[in-house]
Structure formats: C-alpha cells, structure tokens
Amino acid sequence: MLRAGALLGGLGAAGALVGCGDDGSSAGGSTTTAAGGGATTGALIASFPQSTPYIAAGSPARLPYLIADREGVPLRSIDGPVRFTVSRDGTPVGEPVEVTPRSDGVPRAYLPLAFTFADPGIYDVSAEYGGSTLEGSVQVVDRSKITTPMVGDRLPAVASPTTANAMGVDPLCSRDPVCPYHSVSLDAAVASGKPAILVVSTPAFCQTAVCGPLLDHVMEAVGEPGGINVIHSEVYANPTAVDDLAKATVAPVPKAFDMAFEPALFVADASGVVVSRGDIIVDRGELAEMLAPIR
C-alpha cells in the first residue's frame, strides 16, 4: 500500500528541493565531466522519481531534467537546445536527442527528454552543455512493475472526491481560491464519452521547488471546459490534521494509481485512453502541446 511519505521520497534528486521556490538542491548521484575529462561546475538533475519504478521498457518516457550551477542550485534559464545521448554499457542507444528548454511560468528551467527504452536495465544519460558533459543514469523496468497509468493505457475509472461527496478529503481543494474542478467524479468522467483532464496536485502543500503552478496553468489554458471534463484531485486526504505530511493519508486517486510522485497531469481522449502525461514540472508551452490532442 502506498504511504504518504513515498510521495516525497520517490523523487530522488527533485525531492531534495524541499519547499516551493527554495533554492536548495542536490545532484542526486548525477556527475559532471568536462569535455576534456576534468571536473567542472554544474550537474544534471533528474526531476522525476529515482528510487521507485518509473520508466517502463517499451513505453514512451518523458524525463524532465534540470541543470544546476556550481552551488547545486537549478538554473532559472537554460540555453538550448541541449543534446542528450542515451547509452548502455558504453554503447549509444538510438540517435542523440535535441531537447528544447522549457521555462514559461515555472520556477526552474527544465529539459523534457522524450525517449523510449526498448529493454529493462540501467542506462546512462548524458547532456552536452556549456562545453561540458553532464552525466546521470536511469533504471528501466518491465512494464508490469508500474501501475500508474501511462500513455496508451485507459484512465482508471475510479471514484474521486467531489463537492457532493468529499470521500473524507479535507480540504477538497487546497488552492486559494478553490478551483472549479471538483463537480465530476473521475469514474463518471471516464464513462461520459468526453475527453478528460486530470490534475493530481496539492497547491498549498507542494513539497518541491520544481512542482510549479500546474493547476493554475490548466485553469489558464482550459478556460471554459465546454465538452471536456476537468478534474483536480488533491494528494493528501488530511494534510491539516497532521504535523508531518509523511503521516498524512493519501487521497483516493493517487492511492488508486499507486503514485509515488506529484504533481501529475493525465490527458485522456473521448474513449478514456491517456494521450498525454506530464509529471513533476510542466510549463505553459508544453502543457499546450499535451492538451492539443483533445482540443
């Protein structure tokens, strides 16, 4: 069973960026090597879960990376595009990928690497930036080890808290003022035959400096939903009743999805199939691209 603490601990490097807007950071095991072989400043930071199964073999992965300065603080702007190379046992896998930095409306600039890893195993990921090679590694697991819905999966038809039935979640929405996305339950939305947008986030209790205003961006982008069901699910059921969020009860949707991270965006088409997913950090431009398939 998912514990509330896992929502913080599963982020690896990103989880070390405690407190929204905090400038503290950790490179989380990533290393930095100059092109000539000597040490240099900066590091590649994986802003996605590292200590829990997250990347599935054979499924498209979106891996947001940050670049840190010499003090380990993530850069607010990144010159790009940045070239990424994926390798295994010293052998490149596929072609290098040029990644455009994103930073519109988020606390830190980031690089969303899109890559499909064919097989389970440990892969090396490197990025060329400022004349240096920034290196890290990722673990890819068999698809069966991941239960959170991925692109191509059906969005699970589970009940979510609403204004009519809060299901024990208090507050129902921690945004101030509250958002308008708590009138329809997720199971009803999936069965409606309409596209759906699901945001799992806790605006008032964000625990990383990169979580960003995802819910606000969705509100800004969607406006009047019209023929689209938009649902916001809080992460914790009782955050104000505990003195430590690690002791809080996980809310119904992230518990049902077995999520070890937040925030997250799931975009499903009219048939209920997930067509886009954005975890941890999503800027305005990338959000527009994720919503495009249902607009």
Task: List the model feature ranges, each with a label.
Residues 263-276:
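A short, hydrophobic beta-strand/beta-hairpin element that forms part of a small beta-sheet core
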